């Protein structure tokens, strides 16, 4: 029976995603990833190289999944609200992405920085064009607006204990999840709505 290369790679990436999200790049070992996947460590090295390369692969894949899930780039303030809502939904369903980003920030290296920078600049350019057309508020720089929208959607997952202390509920309560999403959408729209 032939070796299932794609299935093996998928299992290794799933195990690596879970390990890196739980322990960060410094606290994760290749041996633990291989053990979690049920695949020998040598195959892990063969497919992904070293631990840093694997972390970068995992994070890049997770960011690609987010981008595909929340596309397209919004241009009006209502669209920005729904973009923020879709981003919130995705991150609530996939909290490992926010954890991976936090670990990346703590570790100092940036995975696929040139491509990610280009991706974010493209969003900021679309916001800038909408600001020039009067569709979006121009009080904030487009770069700051993009960052703030991402932060609105991500912070609930980044600090769930703070959200629980403030609201008395966690995101497993469907009504609370809906309230949080509505707050994210409303706040994003208010940030982007022209004030004139």
Question: Where are each of the predicted segments found?
Answer:
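N-terminal intrinsically disordered/low-complexity leader segments
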Residues: 1-7, 196
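All-alpha amphipathic helical-bundle segments outside canonical DNA-binding/catalytic cores
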Residues: 114-115, 132-148
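Amphipathic alpha-helical linker/stalk segments
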Residues: 3, 56-83, 120, 128
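Helix-turn-helix
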Residues: 11, 15-53, 57
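Amphipathic alpha-helical segments used for helix-helix packing
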Residues: 55, 91-110, 159-167
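C-terminal peripheral helix-coil segments that are non-catalytic and often amphipathic
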Residues: 89-93, 121-133, 151-152, 158-196
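Amphipathic alpha-helical segments that line or abut small-molecule/effector binding pockets
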Residues: 14, 77-106, 117, 143-150, ...
């Amino acid at each position: 029976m032939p070796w299932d290369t794609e299935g093996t790679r998928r299992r290794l990436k799933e195990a690596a995603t879970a390990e890196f999200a739980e322990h960060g790049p410094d606290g994760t070992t290749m041996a633990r990833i291989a053990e979690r996947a049920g695949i020998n460590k040598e195959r892990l090295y063969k497919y992904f190289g070293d631990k840093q390369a694997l972390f970068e692969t995992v994070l890049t894949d997770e960011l690609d999944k987010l981008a595909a899930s929340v596309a397209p780039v919004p241009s009006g303030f209502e669209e920005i609200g729904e973009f923020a809502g879709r981003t919130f939904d995705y991150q609530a369903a996939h909290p490992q992405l926010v954890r991976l980003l936090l670990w990346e920030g703590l570790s100092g290296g940036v995975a696929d920085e040139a491509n990610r920078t280009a991706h974010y600049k493209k969003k900021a350019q679309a916001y800038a064009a909408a600001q020039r057309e009067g569709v979006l508020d121009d009080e904030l720089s487009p770069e700051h607006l993009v960052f703030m929208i991402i932060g609105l959607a991500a912070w609930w997952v980044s600090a769930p204990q703070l959200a629980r202390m403030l609201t008395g509920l966690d995101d497993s309560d469907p009504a609370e999840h809906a309230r949080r999403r509505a707050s994210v959408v409303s706040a994003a729209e208010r940030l982007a709505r022209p004030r004139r």
